[in-house]
A protein has these predicted regions:
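Flexible interdomain linker/hinge and immediately adjacent N-terminus
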Residues: 1-25, 75, 114-120
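Residue-level marker of regulatory loop/turn positions in helix-turn-helix DNA-binding domains and
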Residues: 12, 31-32, 42, 125, ...
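Basic, Lys/Arg- and aromatic-enriched nucleic-acid-binding interface segment
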Residues: 17-50
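Short, leucine-enriched amphipathic alpha-helices that occur as contiguous helical runs
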Residues: 20, 35-37, 126, 130, ...
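Mobile genetic element proteins and their domesticated derivatives, centered on retroelements
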Residues: 23, 39, 47, 73, ...
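Short, charged phosphate-coordinating catalytic segments
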Residues: 43-67, 170-174
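Basic, alpha-helical nucleic-acid-contacting "clamp/cap" segments
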Residues: 64-120, 131-140
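Short, basic (Lys/Arg/His-rich) helix/loop patches that form interaction surfaces
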Residues: 106, 130-174, 181, 193
C-alpha cells in the first residue's frame, strides 16, 4: 500500500544488543521468563522472521560443519523449496535451548504458548511474537515515545549491530537471508554514521 501511494514503509523499531540486554534482565527463571529469554535470544541471533521463529523445532538444533552449535532453518520466505540452511547460534543459546527442553520435557516446537494457568500449549503463533515483544517492552517502562517492538525488530536491530561492528554488507545479507542489496539496505536505512 505504501508503495502505491508513494510513501516509504515505516521502519521497525530496532531491537539492538543494548535493548536486548535490557529486555533479558527482566526475564526470570519462571516458565514464561525462560520462554521469553529463548524468544529474545533466538530471534536476535538468527535474524529470522516471525513465522520462521515459530517453525523451529528442538530436532532442528544441531552442530554446524565446524562443530559449533547451530540450528537448521528448514523453510523460509526466500527458500520456498525447503532447501534449508544451517544458522550458527551461540553456546549460551544452545545451553538455554537444552534447559528449556528439559523444563518443558517435550519435543516438537521450541516456541510455545503458555496460558494464564501456566500450561504449555502448542507452538506459538507468529502474531504472538509482536504481542510478547510489546509486553516485554512495556515491562521495561521505557519512554512512551518509543515505537513498539515488532516481529521485524530482531532483523533490524541485529543487522544494525552487525553494521556497527564493521561487518560487510554481504555477510549481513547472508545472516539475514536477504538475496538483494536493496532488501538488506532497506533494513539498514536508519543507520546513523
Amino acid at each position: 500500500m505504501h508503495r502505491k501511494i508513494g510513501r516509504a514503509q515505516p521502519q521497525a523499531t530496532p531491537l539492538t544488543k543494548q535493548l536486548l540486554n535490557q529486555l533479558l534482565s527482566n526475564c526470570d527463571n519462571s516458565l514464561r521468563g525462560l520462554r521469553n529469554e529463548v524468544l529474545l535470544r533466538l530471534g536476535y541471533e538468527t535474524m529470522r522472521r516471525r513465522s520462521e521463529l515459530c517453525a523451529f523445532k528442538f530436532e532442528d538444533i544441531c552442530k554446524g560443519a565446524n562443530g559449533k552449535p547451530a540450528i537448521r532453518l528448514n523453510f523460509s520466505k526466500t527458500d520456498q523449496f525447503g532447501t534449508g540452511k544451517i544458522l550458527p547460534i551461540s553456546q549460551e543459546l544452545f545451553d538455554l535451548l537444552e534447559k528449556w527442553r528439559r523444563m518443558i520435557s517435550d519435543e516438537g516446537y521450541i516456541l510455545r504458548s503458555i496460558n494464564r494457568h501456566g500450561h504449555i500449549g502448542s507452538n506459538l503463533h507468529p502474531a504472538s511474537i509482536s504481542i510478547l515483544l510489546k509486553a516485554l517492552q512495556k515491562d521495561l517502562k521505557v519512554d512512551s515515545d518509543e515505537k513498539p517492538l515488532s516481529g521485524h525488530s530482531f532483523r533490524v536491530g541485529a543487522a544494525l549491530d552487525l553494521l556497527e561492528q564493521g561487518e560487510p554488507l554481504e555477510r549481513i545479507m547472508l545472516r539475514g537471508g536477504w538475496q538483494t542489496d536493496s532488501s538488506a539496505i532497506n533494513y539498514l536505512r536508519n543507520w546513523s554514521m
